[in-house]
């Protein structure tokens, strides 16, 4: 257990990287790398797009984008369609951040600051979507539903949401690490590699889906109050 404790402390430690005399957290540097990678891939995939006689690459890209857009639009409705690009962008970032562990790089999502930032961005957009759909008065009125006595609970619910999103993502990613370390202690050869691949690939993608799905559900609830 001492080995597990030491490994956990090392994993939770925020490493700093010196860039031009500035100490920058490793998770931030890795996030920059992920964003640069996504920008380059986006440029490569979207260049030379055509209206007629499209290439197989463009056909596959359109199918993927249309499928994801239809999924979120079906969940949020037409009013929530404007927020689909954000959800897709966050999904791509979290997926890459979780999968980067396959290459021996510490995932940024193991840094509580990163998951907290993602949760805060999402919750700001969730509340904005509610204000945009209902108007300022309608949003304030929703805080008193179903009766004014519930106002403190409704405000508390808004405050709890980012904590829920943040800790769920951080906790699941960290939990996968703890499971891997326990497996290494029991079966140190061969088996850990298989479980590591599973946790890095499938569990990382599952956590991506859970985060954006919960964000979209909260957003739907916030928008749907006007109906």
Question: Across the structure, where does each feature detected by a protein language model lie?
Answer:
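Selective transmembrane helix interface/packing segments
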Residues: 1-227
């Amino acid at each position: 257990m001492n080995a597990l404790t030491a490994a956990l402390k090392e994993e939770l430690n925020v490493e700093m990287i010196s860039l031009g005399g500035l100490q920058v957290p490793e998770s931030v540097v890795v996030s920059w790398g992920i964003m640069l990678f996504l920008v380059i891939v986006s440029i490569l995939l979207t260049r030379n797009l055509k209206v007629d006689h499209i290439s197989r690459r463009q056909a596959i890209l359109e199918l993927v984008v249309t499928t994801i857009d239809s999924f979120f639009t079906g969940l949020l409705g037409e009013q929530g369609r404007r927020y689909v690009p954000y959800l897709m962008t966050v999904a791509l970032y979290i997926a890459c951040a979780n999968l980067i562990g396959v290459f021996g790089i510490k995932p940024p999502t193991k840094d509580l600051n990163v998951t907290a930032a993602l949760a805060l961005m999402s919750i700001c957009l969730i509340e904005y979507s509610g204000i945009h759909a209902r108007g300022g008065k309608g949003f304030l009125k929703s805080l008193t539903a179903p009766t004014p006595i519930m106002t403190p609970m409704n405000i508390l619910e808004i405050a709890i949401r980012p904590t829920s999103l943040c800790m769920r993502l951080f906790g699941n990613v960290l939990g996968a690490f703890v499971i891997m370390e326990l497996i290494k202690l029991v079966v140190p050869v061969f088996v850990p590699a298989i479980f590591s691949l599973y946790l890095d690939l499938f569990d990382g993608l599952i956590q991506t889906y859970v985060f954006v799905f919960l964000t979209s559900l909260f957003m739907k609830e916030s928008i749907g109050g006007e109906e």
